[in-house]
């Protein structure tokens, strides 16, 4: 029989799952919470996200080296332009994203 888990048991199972590449993820930002999490096993895409139900999304990878973010403003401009090109609204203004990253 398939078990029915309560919330705590579900989260515990989720945290026990192996996540390939998790050792390469230092943290992620969850815009719905307005917070950063350092447990990559909790990084999930919600079902109502454009990425899931429409298959579109904008991604930007930023290099962080020697305690500095490299070319942040150029990355943020590209992020905004890419989102506009797909008619997507960013979850918050670019200035706020900049503050979150820094």
Stretches with model-predicted labels:
Residues 1-102:
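Conserved alpha/beta cores of soluble small-molecule-handling proteins
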């Amino acid at each position: 029989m398939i078990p029915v888990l309560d919330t705590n048991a579900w989260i515990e199972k989720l945290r026990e799952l192996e996540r390939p590449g998790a050792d390469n993820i230092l943290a992620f930002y969850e815009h719905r919470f307005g917070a950063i999490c350092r447990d990559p096993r909790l990084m999930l895409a919600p079902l109502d996200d454009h990425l899931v139900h429409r298959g579109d999304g904008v991604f930007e990878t930023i290099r962080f080296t020697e305690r500095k973010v490299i070319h942040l403003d150029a990355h943020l401009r590209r992020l905004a332009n890419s989102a506009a090109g797909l008619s997507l609204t960013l979850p918050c203004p670019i200035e706020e994203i900049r503050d979150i990253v820094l």
